């Protein structure tokens, strides 16, 4: 067991600034209006830094820097851009622990997840898109003896990116890596709840990227996010967040006829078929862990398996074992490597989760475990902690239909394959799903029948590069973490060339 020290305290691997300006043109820039907002850590609930409260003027300044940098960066040879991405990956890897501590203090997640998943995935995604870029090819089409069509991939230019608060670094990397690989300059707005860790990363890689290629502007959605998304000087906007906000982003982008990619909400079903319990073996234990994945990252995951659908024939036994597994989840200091579930990212989110627990109870759902705020005592007593909560109820209830974004799972039973698929698809969302079965035919048929962009089969919450990620229905547009994302940050130039000396003879 290792308990890392809080930033700025004796023995800590990192100190954070008492005030953060915006990162524009490769340097710190104070907000145009000179305003800042206090930022608390979810770990203790105490304020620890001030963050630039930016406006449209700061967005314009960042766009100036991005437009100044974009032409040269876009002309950089693919091999050189790939090498830059590789150096960024190396730098993250060299400072993994410092970045993990910053991420925990910013977001509240347990450091075991940041060290084992978030940061290694960030490293791998930069390396992946470096490789994808080197392997990308244009095309040549010979249309007839004298006419050839050449197709070139060209960067869009300057793009806007708006990042959520649940994975502040990893979600930023998911967007930055393909955008940079494609040759774009970026203006990025982090979530106001988690503005710090990305700025720590900017300082770490300042000597690697040309100034202005990445610019980070902090602030609130209406004051900084909207001026970015609606700005005619960006060629694309990428957004991860809540579905209603995603609709607004689409409206803003439509005014300038620019493309969007959106990764939005979810209410993911996790299906456990009867043969899961055919033996009490490693697979059964794996399935129980798959059930408990609703508590990963405190349930603050768009693909949180927040609806558990269990076959009627194994319902009581499997649910009993799942309850035991959930109650064994260790909640504690997020900086302790033994802690499995940390703090919610903000007090607002804490209150939202608690309100949904009240809603579920009022609807008649039964709380099987959890259902309350947790006071960890001492310096952690003001932190934003919720016990992992299991409801038993009906898929028509709000807790089954609405995204809670917390460590809350709603459980119901199904009677046969058709009933399982019907319940799974009875949702507005279609981001993720899980299927657990020992039967390959059931696994394949269920995976194809579920209306979701990512269906984990006998696994859950794996996010490797080269596996496309994105939603159906109200869960978004576009695919990330795959080479196809490079296309979202490029436009195709066609040169249609005639090598004949003779004209067509029309005039």
Swiss-Prot record:
Q: Which InterPro entries match?
A: Ald_DH/histidinol_DH, Ald_DH_C, Ald_DH_CS_CYS, Ald_DH_CS_GLU, Ald_DH_N, Aldehyde_DH_dom
A Pfam family for this UniProt protein? Aldedh
Q: Which GO terms describe its molecular function?
A: fluoroacetaldehyde dehydrogenase (NAD+) activity
Fetch the Gene3D superfamilies from UniProt: Aldehyde Dehydrogenase, Chain A, domain 1 (3.40.605.10), Aldehyde Dehydrogenase, Chain A, domain 2 (3.40.309.10)
Q: Name one GO biological process term.
A: protein homotetramerization
Q: Which residues bind NAD(+)?
A: 219-225
Active site residues per record: 263, 302
EC code: 1.2.1.69
Q: Which reaction does it catalyse?
A: fluoroacetaldehyde + NAD(+) + H2O = fluoroacetate + NADH + 2 H(+)
**What keywords does the record list, in alphabetical order?**
NAD, Oxidoreductase
Q: Which family does it belong to?
A: Belongs to the aldehyde dehydrogenase family.
**Record function comment:** Catalyzes the oxidation of fluoroacetaldehyde to fluoroacetate. Has high affinity for fluoroacetate and glycolaldehyde but not for acetaldehyde.
Q: How does it assemble?
A: Homotetramer.
Q: Know the name of this protein?
A: Fluoroacetaldehyde dehydrogenase
